[in-house]
Amino acid sequence: MPQGVDDACSLPVLTYMHGTIFQRTSAPSFLSSEGQFGFLMSSPGFIVLMPDYVGLGTSELMHPYVHAQSEAESGIYLIQAAEALGEELGYSFNGEFFSTGYSQGGHASMALSRELETNYSDVYPLTASAPLSGPYDISGTQFIQIFENTSYSNPAYLAYNIIGWNSYYGNLYEDLSEVFQEPYATGLPGMFNGEMSAMEINDYLPFLLEDLIQPGLVEEITGDPDHPFNIAAQNNDVYEWVPQTPLKMYYCTQDEQVFYQNALVAEAWMNENGAENVSSSNGGPLDHGDCAGPAILGGMLWMQDFAVECETSFVGQNARKPWTIAPNPSVNGTTVIAGLPTSVTWEIVDITGRTIHSGSGLQVDFSSNAEGIYFIKTDNWGVKRVLVHP
C-alpha cells in the first residue's frame, strides 16, 4: 500500500507477476528480493498485489512452470481477495487495473491481462499492461530456438517446464527416463522439492542438451504436431488474442534465457489481427539479468501515465498548486521547476527512497547523478518524477 494516502482516496491496482523461482520461500509472500519491488511500485500511488503461483510460497504442490491458466488464476484470486479485504483494511479500488511482470512474470502478466479482458472486463477492467521479457510464444519462438542450439543457458528451466507441465497434464511422459538420460532422470525429481536453487539445479545438469535429452526425442516431438508436448506448449502460448487496452512489451536483444523474438511475434500477431494500441520497446543489447531493471522501471513509468492520481495527505496544503519540471528527461544534467516560488526547497530522492542531495531555487542540478529515475520532493508542493540521461 502507498503511504500517506488520504482516507478518501480510491486507488488503482497493479498486479505484479514474479519471475522464475525454484525455492518456495523466494515467493513474494516471504518478502523475497523480488517481493521488495512491491514497496517501490506502490510509491506512486498503486495498491500493489504480488501473487505466489501454484506450488510456491506455502503451497506444497509441484509448480506447473509457465502454465498460463494457473498463473492468470493466481492474479485473479488475489485481486478478489484484496477487494474483499478493502473495507476491513481501509482502502478501496478506483476501477483501474494494471498488470506487469518480468521473465516468467512477463508470460504470467500476459496471461492475466488476457483473462481480465476476456472474462472480467465488467468487474476488473484492465487499464493497461506491460509484460516484460516473457516467453509468449512457447511453442514457436522459445522452444524452437532452444532446440536449434546445442546448449541452453539455463537447462533447469527446461526440466522445470517438462516436470511441471506433466504434474498438471499427466500425459507428457509416464517415466522421466522417456525424456531425460541418466543420471538426470533419476536425480531431477528430488531437486524440484521447493528447496533447491536455480544455480544448484543448473550446476547438476550437463552443458550440452544432447547429454541431457534422450536421443531422437526432439525429432519425435517436432515431427508430430499432436505430440502431447506440442499440445501443452500451444495451450500455454499467450499472444494470440487482441488486446482492447494499451499493452507494451519490453525486451532486450542479447537475452539468452527468453529470446527477444517472443515480443516481436506477439506484437506482429496482435497488430495484424486488429489491436490498436500494442507496441514493444527494445532495451538494447542487454542479457536477461541486465535487462530486468530498465524493463521493470520502463514498464512502471509507462503505466503511470494511464493511472488516475489521488492527492495524498503528506504533501501539504499547497500540493494542489500545479507545477512541472522541464525538460524531463533532464538535458545536460539540469532541469527547471516551473510554477513554484523561487524560494522553494527540495530534495532529490532515488528509487529506493534515499535522499541524494538537497537545495533550493528553481534550477535542479543532476550532473553528479547516475543515469536513472529520481524524484524531486518539495516540502509543501508534492513530488515529481524525473528521468536522468547522460
Residue ranges and their predicted role:
Residues 132-240:
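Accessory cap/linker subdomain of secreted extracellular hydrolases
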Residues 65-87:
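Alpha/beta-hydrolase active-site loop
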Residues 143, 230-231, 257, 264-265, ...:
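C-terminal catalytic histidine-bearing segment of alpha/beta-hydrolase fold enzymes
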Residues 371-390:
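C-terminal tail/sorting-segment detector
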